[in-house]
Swiss-Prot record:
Organism: Pelodictyon phaeoclathratiforme (strain DSM 5477 / BU-1)
Function: One of the early assembly proteins it binds 23S rRNA. One of the proteins that surrounds the polypeptide exit tunnel on the outside of the ribosome. Forms the main docking site for trigger factor binding to the ribosome.
Single Gene Ontology MF annotation: rRNA binding
Annotated NCBIfam families: PRK05738.1-3 (NF004359), PRK05738.2-4 (NF004363)
Record protein name field: Large ribosomal subunit protein uL23
Length: 103
């Protein structure tokens, strides 16, 4: 698979995971598996991945009333990956580089 990583997911909860546990959250392609995600993270950021958890998120249903009646639709399903790195490693989302701390 060609680069399953779409973008980092920056929310209050994901930022808390990064600060407290050193876990990073990415939105990935729905058909990506853990081995593809691991290879992509290690190649792009130059870090060692300890573990990966993936979550399939269902898109929300939407409805709108119009002159012709009720129109329903659905947002796309998506997938996120929570990535835990080895001790002493971190990812800087903005510079696309990894940093290793001494110790």
């Amino acid at each position: 698979m060609i680069n399953p990583l779409l973008r980092p997911l920056l929310t209050e909860k994901s930022t808390g995971l990064t600060e407290k546990k050193g876990q990073y959250v990415f939105v990935v392609k729905p058909d990506a598996d853990k081995t593809d995600i691991k290879k992509a993270v290690e190649k792009k950021f130059g870090v060692e991945v300890k573990s990966i958890r993936t979550i399939n998120c269902l898109g929300k249903s939407r409805a709108q009333n119009t002159r012709k009646g009720r129109v329903t639709g659905k947002k796309s399903d998506w997938k996120k990956a929570i990535i835990t790195l080895e001790k002493g490693q971190s990812i800087d989302y903005y510079s696309n580089t990894a940093q290793k701390s001494e110790g």
